[in-house]
Amino acid sequence: MVLPLFRRAAIARTSSLLRARLFAPASEFHSRFSNGLYHLDDKISSSNGVRSASIDLITRMDDSSPKPILRFGVQNFSSTGPISQTVLAMPALSPTMSHGNVVKWMKKEGDKVEVGDVLCEIETDKATVEFESQEEGFLAKILVTEGSKDIPVNEPIAIMVEEEDDIKNVPATIEGGRDGKEETSAHQVMKPDESTQQKSSIQPDASDLPPHVVLEMPALSPTMNQGNIAKWWKKEGDKIEVGDVIGEIETDKATLEFESLEEGYLAKILIPEGSKDVAVGKPIALIVEDAESIEAIKSSSAGSSEVDTVKEVPDSVVDKPTERKAGFTKISPAAKLLILEHGLEASSIEASGPYGTLLKSDVVAAIASGKASKSSASTKKKQPSKETPSKSSSTSKPSVTQSDNNYEDFPNSQIRKIIAKRLLESKQKIPHLYLQSDVVLDPLLAFRKELQENHGVKVSVNDIVIKAVAVALRNVRQANAFWDAEKGDIVMCDSVDISIAVATEKGLMTPIIKNADQKSISAISLEVKELAQKARSGKLAPHEFQGGTFSISNLGMYPVDNFCAIINPPQAGILAVGRGNKVVEPVIGLDGIEKPSVVTKMNVTLSADHRIFDGQVGASFMSELRSNFEDVRRLLL
């Protein structure tokens, strides 16, 4: 059988770079092509009747060390059997992309596809991009459903055929679509007769379990390495369809819905609702194909013991000579102090706090009831005046409440933990330079009043501040940059993208006004309101808060005259904006005589990375910013 001629554009719609087409007439060959600036390394091979063509690397050659620019997915061309098929893989649509989300399929199974047709929309780590077909034919099979998340690059997502009659002969699944290597994903089918089982912190004994799917904690953002189970929307035994929301997961950015990519029945919940810091890839639930298999999962030893193995019990605050299992996962500081003072065995006290926390009240109740056992390691520390638990029950309780200060443990959200970690790293690793200046607000306030009275346009002072900062960054380009730690170089940013600090219940979010220098003040105002509402409701998309070249933190609505903000890495600057205050200053009148006058002034403080901002760059930026406030017409240039 003659293999039909398949071809694929390596770089689509590129006039100045390189266009490459691959042909597969031989059993195997390896070719290289270079145009002096870019180098293409491709390989075409044939094995067991399946021809595979892959563009391994496109390399930039304008420096001493070749630098990878793009890596493409794999296409497999079957030349055996009654049909010829093309397997479309998840493409690498940005240099840093390793996973992608299939947002929407623009074509459905059976549709005719022409070269250049948009097959689907793929959400990368940067933006949502249209995935265009480089082949003509028919979309025979969609392997990855709409809404699927964290699909690895080169993962097969669809199958195309040349003839419409071949659609019915396309297999339901593809084996070896990623060079025959099995990858770990958020959904993996586990069967008793499989020779390889998923390795994780929980590995059930599959010998007595029916075929099932292990749901793992997914990576719902590029920086996520652990998450919290906020809520389970499905309970054990419920029927699940593809696309059903199983639960809510709190990431380091927001609380997101976790949708099922499988249909079946929720047989077992391994991680209970409210669990925190669950590692990405850790099993959280089991799904079976039919309702009859649910009882087999529940009655098996693996299914009944998996929940216990999920919880991590920290070391007790006191030595435990016995092997008695502790009934808690955390101990509050007050409870820890009481246990040490009374020489108690922590494992003998029952915890009643949230998520298995041992509280001070639990220890007091155990002392009063005499149920708490003494620790053998604390006998040497006993005071002579100490009585037995039964005799001290009436006196120990009031003495405890009088000697200890009352407080409440407040568990941090995942967002606050990430913020705390990054701000600490920022202060430790970035040399902060601080510059302050007072700017006159009267021209800005008059301009704002004129917009509202004469044109019906309502904008806030913060909206005008964003525009003023963006124009200053455009005019002082050295201030719109970041530090490349690997190379030790300053990287200048082409666009001015302003991150604005928005306080939410779960922590500080920084949505981005992109290309702020090119937008009108009214457009900035509308976008700020929309992004702030999304941030407070936890519905920001990744591209709406990731990135940014400069930040603004405005506390002018509070009685805060001035403050110093901490740089948000990898950015190099953040402007702290205080409130406006009326002050009396000498002003030269039209007659040339200096007279006292009341003006409104506002303090702004620049926190800058001293590796990028030296004194001259920082002063130039502050001078431009001050000029923008004094003459608002500069914002229209």
Curated annotation (Swiss-Prot):
It is an enzyme of class 2 (transferase). Its EC number is 2.3.1.12. Keywords: Acyltransferase, Lipoyl, Mitochondrion, Repeat, Transferase, Transit peptide. It catalyses: N(6)-[(R)-dihydrolipoyl]-L-lysyl-[protein] + acetyl-CoA = N(6)-[(R)-S(8)-acetyldihydrolipoyl]-L-lysyl-[protein] + CoA. It is found in: Mitochondrion matrix. Residues 171-210, 374-408 are annotated as: Disordered. Residues 390-403 have a biased composition (Low complexity). The keyword Transferase applies. Residues 176-196 have a biased composition (Basic and acidic residues). Residues 85-161, 212-288 form the Lipoyl-binding domain. Its cofactor is (R)-lipoate. Belongs to the 2-oxoacid dehydrogenase family. PANTHER family: DIHYDROLIPOAMIDE ACETYL/SUCCINYL-TRANSFERASE-RELATED (PTHR23151), DIHYDROLIPOYLLYSINE-RESIDUE ACETYLTRANSFERASE COMPONENT OF PYRUVATE DEHYDROGENASE COMPLEX, MITOCHONDRIAL-RELATED (PTHR23151:SF90). This is Dihydrolipoyllysine-residue acetyltransferase component 1 of pyruvate dehydrogenase complex, mitochondrial. It comes from Arabidopsis thaliana.
